[in-house]
Amino acid sequence: IAAVIVTCNRIELLKRALKSVKEQSRQPNFVYVISNSTADNFLKEQKLCADFGFQILKNYRTENYAGALNTAVEQIITESGISNDLYFASLDDDDEWLPNYLQEIENNNSDNFDLLAGNLLRSSNTENNLLALPNELSEKDFLIGNPGISGSNTFIKLITLLKSGAFDEGLSATIDRDFLVRVFLQKPKYKIVNKHLVTQHTDNDRERVTTNRTKKEESLRVFFYKYQYLMNKVEKEQFFQRIEKLFSISK
């Protein structure tokens, strides 16, 4: 298991995320922290990662979230090659894994699944909402919205990730959904673990990619142009109704 944490100028939040990796009852075999931060903050992150015993790299691809994830993918392949039992487990710097996350996922991986996902708890001052994933998913679920898989509860076989085309660096938001559409088009063997294993912190008093309207609008337009061929008329309407309701973005 390779754990991957992408960070961008959020030292205090990163510390919480790294602590949640360090406290895993089943430790990852490799940990990669990839930084999109300023030079000053990168120095602070290096010190923090050294305290945890984790390696940190500067994102050397496109300077966004997808570029950082792909930097990690390249690094994993360089150091470990590609094998059928190597898994990629990502965590956003503002989220945290429960201490039993990796152990629970591994315990449920009885059939060498391509993808496993546990439930997210969305947590902030204004919400405490457990997103229960349906037991069956397809690419259709990610065309309209997101039923509850994010960067922080994605546990995927490296080979499946590569077959799906890795992460689209042309997008600055909607990266998880875009990736999962392509993953589910592969008809992967997957398992939903119906337990709360990851806490997704959704505080609105700081900028998150999800709340940056310009990035979101631009990425949703690209997403629609990429995948409209998979949507029927009703699904297209649902897509636009959702973005109007959630982000006030009009057709």
Regions found by a protein language model. Give the residues of each.
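Catalytic core of nucleotide-sugar-dependent glycosyltransferases
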Residues: H196-D203, R208-E237
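A conserved acidic beta->alpha catalytic loop
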Residues: V33-E45, R61, D92-D95
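Conserved donor NDP-sugar-binding/catalytic core segment of glycosyltransferases
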Residues: E96, N100-N129
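Acidic donor-binding loop at a coil-to-helix junction in glycosyltransferase catalytic cores
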Residues: A173-F179
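Glycine-rich, basic loop-to-helix element that forms the pyrophosphate-binding segment
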Residues: N59-S80
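Short beta-strand-to-loop acidic/aromatic patch adjacent to the donor-nucleotide binding site
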Residues: S83-E96
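Catalytic beta-strand/loop signature of glycosyltransferases that borders the donor
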Residues: N119, K191-L197
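Short, acidic, metal-binding catalytic loop of nucleotide-sugar glycosyltransferases
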Residues: K19-P28
